[in-house]
Amino acid sequence: MINVGLLFGSKSVEHEISIITAHQVLSFVDKNKYNIIPIYITKDGKWLTGKILEDLENFKNLERLEKKSKQISSISAKDGKLILHSNIKKITIDVCLLTFHGSNGEDGSIQGMLEFLNVPYTGCGMYSSMYTMDKVITKLILKEKNIPVVDFLYTNKKNYTNDFLNHCKEVLEYPMIVKPARLGSSIGVKKVNDKCELEEAIETAFSFDDKVIVEKWIDSRELNCAVMGYKNIVVSEIEEIKKQKDFFDYNEKYVQKGKKFSNHIIPAPIDENLKNTIKSIARDTFNALECHGNIRIDFLLSKDNKIYVNEVNSIPGALSYYLWQMSGFTFSQVIDNMISIAFEAFKDKKSKIYSIDTNLFDLKVEK
């Protein structure tokens, strides 16, 4: 049986969403194939494990949860396996299944640690996770590859001045959408119609991230699809999100009906040509950002039927199982595929050369 470390939580404003995704995995994973070891990272960075983490109800009382959990005191690795030390107990992990959302988990930070420790993990690699987490880097790469994105500008807290507000008006025109550059779940996102609203929205976005992207707002439909694979890529069915406002916000996604997927129309009511175009752009996006694993790509469809890549999620909420279900995959099969891809990518990584058989300090230097 394969020991799977299910990592979730972490220091992120999307912390609770990560917990939900992890427990969806716990509900549907094939326990005849995998021994699931939950590893919860608290908001202040503690690493916890234990059976108590397997019941979502226990997360209502975090103080009790921490007391009843086993704190991981140290982490090491040997022979491609992650080793966790908790009191006197040692836990060995064969592969890590990542269900983080947002900063300090989905952004390449945990992936970088696992790369350094030489341990297989699900989802995109370190660099790809970093690219896709940053909306600015994502759009710059896609633009370079001639993949359609809406017009945008960006700034950071260090260099931000009033001139940026004027530049936005000249280049983008109102209305615009303001977003923290490295955040998901529509947190901190605002539509603005004038300079005063723009300035206020940028300040709000800066409270979540020190980098902000401002995009031209277009009246559009929101379409999504998932892409999964490594060397062979498969694209899921396409969905349409029926939004109640100008964009599908955090409240709709997780607090109101959005959490029950009542706003999701699968398959999306679009013609076959448009469907094929979106799937083709999805494949190109997956490759341009050097992704592997299971991602979700969000699109905008304008009134004149132009398609734009809006955002890329390297660890989508609920692992986009609802999209894969409509494409003939069970949630359990999605998890199987993600773990298989993790091992395949790890095998390729092991073939790389990381050192040269030369001792520079032992070389004789002619005088």
Swiss-Prot record:
The keyword Transferase does not apply. Keywords: ATP-binding, Cell shape, Cell wall biogenesis/degradation, Cytoplasm, Ligase, Magnesium, Manganese, Metal-binding, Nucleotide-binding, Peptidoglycan synthesis. Residues 139-340 form the ATP-grasp domain. Its main location: cytoplasm. It is found in: Cytoplasm. Mg(2+) 2 binds at residues 311, 313. Its cofactor is Mg(2+); Mn(2+). GO terms for biological process: cell wall organization; peptidoglycan biosynthetic process; regulation of cell shape. It catalyses: 2 D-alanine + ATP = D-alanyl-D-alanine + ADP + phosphate + H(+). Pfam families: Dala_Dala_lig_C, Dala_Dala_lig_N. Binds 2 magnesium or manganese ions per subunit. InterPro entries: ATP-grasp, ATP_grasp_subdomain_1, D-Ala_lig_Van_CS, D_ala_D_ala, Dala_Dala_lig_C, Dala_Dala_lig_N, PreATP-grasp_dom_sf. ATP binds at residues 169-224. GO terms for cellular component: cytosol. One of its GO terms (molecular function) is D-alanine-D-alanine ligase activity. Pathway: Cell wall biogenesis; peptidoglycan biosynthesis. PROSITE patterns: ATP_GRASP (PS50975), DALA_DALA_LIGASE_1 (PS00843), DALA_DALA_LIGASE_2 (PS00844). The keyword Disulfide bond does not apply. It is an enzyme of class 6 (ligase). Coiled coil: none annotated. Its EC number is 6.3.2.4. Mg(2+) 1 binds at residues 298, 311. Belongs to the D-alanine--D-alanine ligase family. Cell wall formation. HAMAP family: Dala_Dala_lig (MF_00047). This is D-alanine--D-alanine ligase.
